[in-house]
């Protein structure tokens, strides 16, 4: 699931909905990551290489995840719209999790939100997981010459757990820094061999 932090003092309220469909968690799961199966106890039990293999396991039932995205996320967005009596015209963009382009375009079609108002950072960066929402927001404002003080946007995240959420926020475009690309990468000099 994707998250973004936008911390500043504002007078406008923030509206949102959060949901979890825990019974279907096995559709999209990283079964041996996180606190449920801590890494070092797995090393002690299985050895380092097997623990690394377990930690890196990821399972996704693709068609079920697609159905979840196009059913549950659509339902949640429609519930948000109804509960908070809002219109899509109020929002500059819908910054949603960049799972894949097919999900995004079908989601836009189903909720009748203009695809032109959904930044597609997935095209340049791929699925960046929890960074995809703030990346989409920053890409949108860095590609737009704006002097506006604020912009209303919808953010929508969904994914592992099967968790999903939508929040309507007001951002200050001048605080959305441009994304820049570098060719270099930092090499910390560490290797897995150092920790066996």
Locations of regions flagged by a protein language model:
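Fold-independent oxyanion-binding glycine-rich loops
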Residues: 9, 16, 158
């Amino acid at each position: 699931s994707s998250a973004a932090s936008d911390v500043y003092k504002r007078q406008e309220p923030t509206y949102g909905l959060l949901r979890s469909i825990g019974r279907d968690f096995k559709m999209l799961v990283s079964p041996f990551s996180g606190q449920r199966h801590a890494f070092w106890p797995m090393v002690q039990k299985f050895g380092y290489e097997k623990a690394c293999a377990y930690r890196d396991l990821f399972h996704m039932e693709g068609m079920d995840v697609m159905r979840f995205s196009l059913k549950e996320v659509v339902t949640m967005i429609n519930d948000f719209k109804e509960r908070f009596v809002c219109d899509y015209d109020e929002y500059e963009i819908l910054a949603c999790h960049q799972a894949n382009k097919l999900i995004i375009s079908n989601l836009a079609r189903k909720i009748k939100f203009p695809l032109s108002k959904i930044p597609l950072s997935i095209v340049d960066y791929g699925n960046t997981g929890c960074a995809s929402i703030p990346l989409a927001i920053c890409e949108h404002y860095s590609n737009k010459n704006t002097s506006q003080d604020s912009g209303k946007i919808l953010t929508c995240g969904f994914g592992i757990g099967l968790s999903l959420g939508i929040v309507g926020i007001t951002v200050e475009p001048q605080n959305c820094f441009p994304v820049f690309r570098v060719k270099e990468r930092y090499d910390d000099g560490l290797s897995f061999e150092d920790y066996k």
